[in-house]
Amino acid sequence: MSTIETLRRVLHECRTIAVVGLSPQWHRPSHFVGKYLLAHGYRMVPVNPMATEIIGEPCYPDLRTAATALKTQGITIDMVDCFRKSEDMPPLADDAIAIGAKCLWMQLGVVNEEAAAKARAAGLGVVMDRCVKIEHARLFGGLNWAGVNTRVISAKRPQQLPY
């Protein structure tokens, strides 16, 4: 599941995204992704057993707890975005299936064929070794040196951003 049309459809349809392994530390890649998702209209659900709140959102210790808490509000998790090691993925695939997610997304460097096969067999879309932030920016406009779309085309890095 990595054709441009499929990625675009997944990113358009999946509006509530649980970010498993989201870090409360501002300089971590997962934190950047969480902020990006919020800034682009997604409902981002932090999942990290070591935190109670990240980026102003309540944080849950595991995926099933998050899904149960959100279900009381009438919200379902559409995508599970995983910032975990490849070997940690099979139990997360089981959790994604159990909560009724539509897509299991494994971040850059994360590939696990066993987890992918489980998820696909249950009807989930699977994306491996790709970053949600990068793919969204690439497919919907928004990539440049600073990670945002300045609408300026140049091969030279600007001294200052024009906004």
Model-derived regions, located:
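Glycine-rich, highly charged phosphate/nucleotide-binding loops
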Residues: 1-3, 54-90
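NAD(P)-binding Rossmann-fold cofactor-contacting core
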Residues: 25-28, 35-55
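A short helix->loop->beta-strand "cap" motif at the edges of active sites that frequently abuts
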Residues: 40-42, 99-104, 122-124
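Mid-chain, well-packed structural core segment of small domains
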Residues: 73-113
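Rossmann-fold NAD(P)-binding glycine/threonine-rich loop
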Residues: 108-134
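A charged, well-structured terminal subsegment
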Residues: 135-163
